[in-house]
């Protein structure tokens, strides 16, 4: 799924919301750097006082395809520091 953001196209990934009491996944825009490595982007409605993201905007993450309620989607599973170590 593609989301237009500024002058480039970004992918949509899912990030876990913390402190919700149940598993909640937030769709967020992300810039793909490699096949499974993304930088989480800041959507216009981002408000850290309302939602606590496991990986906030600016975080470099590794994603895996996971089954969620509505299908299989790329889900951020861990933070990484180096794009070369994520393959």
Question: Model-flagged regions — what are they?
Answer:
Residues 2-87:
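Mixed-charge, low-complexity intrinsically disordered regions
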């Amino acid at each position: 799924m593609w989301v237009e953001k500024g002058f480039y196209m970004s992918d949509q990934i899912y990030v876990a919301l913390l402190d919700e009491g149940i598993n909640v996944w937030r769709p967020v825009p992300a810039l793909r750097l490699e096949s499974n490595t993304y930088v989480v982007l800041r959507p216009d409605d981002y408000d850290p006082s309302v939602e606590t993201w496991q990986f906030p905007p600016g975080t470099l993450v590794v994603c895996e395809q996971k089954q969620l309620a509505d299908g299989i989607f790329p889900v951020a599973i861990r933070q990484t520091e180096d794009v070369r170590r994520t393959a």
